[in-house]
Amino acid sequence: MINVNCLNNIAACGLKLFSDEYNTESSFEDAQAVLVRSAKMHDMELSDNLLAIARAGAGVNNIPLDKCAEEGIVVFNTPGANANAVKGQVIAAMLLASRDLIGGNKWVADNAEDPDIAKATEKAKKAFAGQEIKGKKLGVIGLGAIGQLVANAAIALGMEVYGYDPYVSVKAAWNLSSEVKYISDVKDIYKECNYITVHVPALDSTKGMINKEAFDLMQDGTVIINCARDVLVDEAAIGEALKSGRVKTYVSDFPNPTTAKMEGAIVLPHLGASTAEAEDNCAIMAVNELRNFIENGNIVNSVNYPNCDCGVCATKGRITVCHKNVPTVISKITTVLGAAGINISSMANQSRGDYAYSLLDIEASAPEAVVEELSAIEGVIKVRVIK
């Protein structure tokens, strides 16, 4: 029985994909696999039983990635599973910032008891007049799964779209509309665009990237949209930019005591991925990733170990090894198997930074003594027998 712990509520359509060999009611301490959404794991003690963690979503700043890698715990996320939901919110954010729909709705609520509200509306509506987004310039910082959908949708709405991403993948580039103008210097986004939306992970290099220096380059009346991570925007700097008029509206999906009181900000309660469809997609993708890893040893969409997919094992045995990305480890693994008279039918090895992953299909079952010998190799972190 494989024990699975859910640190947050996970959509039932995902959990039902587990076979009867899985117990999804396990405690965290006994779990071999964990499903998580937003629960903070940095202070949690990770047991020796734990093999994998799957984040039902894209961001993984709530998971201790380095600690997990050191202990041979593979961490997965679900890139793209909630992208359409976030795209929809970004489009809505642009409309909310352009047309004072919130103010108009509040006026109606405040005057709901007025018997002449219909007549009063014709005079009052002038206060809520806005502008269209068609023909305006949108800068998209980050062209991953979400950014590319936002860019393409904005093109369809008649906007002039500029995209910036120094690490854009070939796949993302192929999916991007040819009408998107690719920008090599993010400063040009700040200078040119009326609307700017950011879609990058929270890294040391991106924290506070939308700062005073960025605002100084922008046109007056710029709209900033942040449905990615709260730390990407320097809140003190954007507060000043709102007061000066450099920024017309800041739409944030991350309420806190600062943004909640910020005049000129539209702050939403972290709704970007909160659609039934997105939660279902994330749960299904996360469960499939866990099952593929537990049952086949394959790694797809890991954030701390390299991807390594050899399909379903067709030989008598399969061994997986999490290890340091250092010389001689591979040769020592093959030497141990050779000395035990075990032939390697096929082998895959991939590396990612300081860590590597090896998957070996063998023509005989590996006895416990061989597993112990493999585990004793310097640089080896975790050995697992799939079959």
Where are these regions (language model features)?
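Oxidoreductase and adenylate-handling cofactor-binding alpha/beta cores
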Residues: K87-K106, N152-M159, M285-N298, T334-G338, ...
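Rossmann-like adenosine-cofactor binding region
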Residues: A39-M44, P166-T259, S274
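N-terminal Rossmann-fold NAD(P) dinucleotide-binding loop
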Residues: G147-Q148
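NAD(P)-dependent dehydrogenase/reductase Rossmann-like domain
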Residues: E263, L271-K387
